[in-house]
Amino acid sequence: MVNTQNQISQTSELDYIVNQPYKYGFKTSVESEQFPRGISEDIVRLISKKKDEPEYLLNFRLKAYKKWKKMSSPSWAHIKHPNIDFNTIIYYAVPKLKKELKSLDEVDPEILDTFNKLGISLNEQKRISNVAVDAVFDSVSIATTFKKELSEAGVIFCSISEAIRDYPELIKKYLGTVVPAGDNYFAALNSAVFSDGSFCYIPPNTVCPLELSTYFRINNEESGQFERTLIIADRGSKVSYLEGCTAPQFDTNQLHAAIVELVALEGAEIKYSTVQNWYAGNKEGKGGIYNFVTKRGLCSGNNSKISWTQVETGSAITWKYPSCILAGENSQGEFYSVALTNNYQEADTGTKMIHIGNNTKSRIISKGISAGRSKNSYRGLVKVGPQSFNSRNYSQCDSLLIGQSSQANTFPYIQVQNPTSKVEHEASTSKISEDQIFYFLQRGINLEESIALMISGFCKDVFNELPMEFATEADRLLSLKLEGTVG
């Protein structure tokens, strides 16, 4: 009887730990300029005109819009959500600005205060670590820090709107080459209506002197966010990039449909890390962000490398598969992921590793943590082409269940068309057991700390791949999510 009471007590406390409010759910009161609801060719033209874009980019948008109109929303993922009414969404919403911003002094103090509350200081004198930040608020980039310091090394880091204006040769050459306008339903939508995002170019034989980071904030309840990121690492260069994101707490759902394109030329290396903490909805599953993202990297040069690392804790729905196309000989692709779902969250995420060149290597480490009534699925494709000789892949997919009602799924797809190649895949599903909790409690460690330690150990292979400045933050984010500070 005593044992049963202890089990009930532990279960109740565990439920309390994983069902706490979202820390970043505040809304910023700021006057905004926005287009009418709904999507049409007129809206696409308005966005392009508002941004004073060249004709080739308008044509790119219109082509994408026409393709999107002929496509259907994907239904194969292991997620369920109401049909999205795309005509109720505002596709362009920006804080009202009297003029083009020349310095942070001209940014609305409310917006600066928002990023300060999020721990993202846009004041270069107040930086804590070696990080340059591009801050995106709804449909516009508010500020990019340390541009002068980066430019001295030849590095271009700015909003994609600035890049379209100031570096048209690079945009024409690379935009849409990794993720074509009609790649998938949400990529086509983004290609038609994207408003801002980040652009980065690392010149040959240059190691970027700062970590680069973009922070995305959705503030408007009725608007979606459709940013686009393009990173080009020229031959022999290296760059590390981190993105983070949050949103206010609304009872309705907002749509986030982004594209990230990475291009690594000969001998170049790109490390792209994400800490995703969009609002996930309340414990009854009401509200939250629908997160439909296309991320893909192209190792076009020999001896190039792209590494994706992601920590996913937010969003009501997550649908994203950061991928690598290994075209160059001896190129490498890596994917390290922690995805934590809770309450009624649903995540269908994973990666694709496409081996084309000889002697290519890929590594996949995926950790899924499911709590409450959530569903957490890993979906991965490893494809070895017929001309990809001596290629190698290793995949490890581990799932951890917390509670009685959560789900974990693994959907691996493996296609090998070359007999000289080697592919390994292993998967496991485990549960935090009463014996494990009892072991910690007997040593004076409370339930919250016990679970945090077990989660940290479970995720260490991924956290070790994050940039040093953010590994501790990611560990803390998961702990806080389970302790009750970040719901």
From Swiss-Prot:
Entry's Gene Ontology BP terms: iron-sulfur cluster assembly
Keyword Plastid applies: yes
Alphabetized InterPro entries for the sequence: Fe-S_cluster_assembly_SufBD, SUF_FeS_clus_asmbl_SufB, SUF_FeS_clus_asmbl_SufBD_core, SUF_FeS_clus_asmbl_SufBD_sf, SufBD_N
Subcellular location: Plastid, Chloroplast
Keyword Cell membrane included in the entry's annotation: no
Signal peptide: none
Keywords per UniProt: Chloroplast, Plastid
GO cellular component terms attached to this protein's record: chloroplast
NCBIfam families: PRK11814.1 (NF008773), sufB (TIGR01980)
Similarity comment text for this entry: Belongs to the iron-sulfur cluster assembly SufBD family.
Protein name listed in UniProt: Iron-sulfur cluster assembly SufBD family protein ycf24
Lineage: Eukaryota, Rhodophyta, Bangiophyceae, Bangiales, Bangiaceae
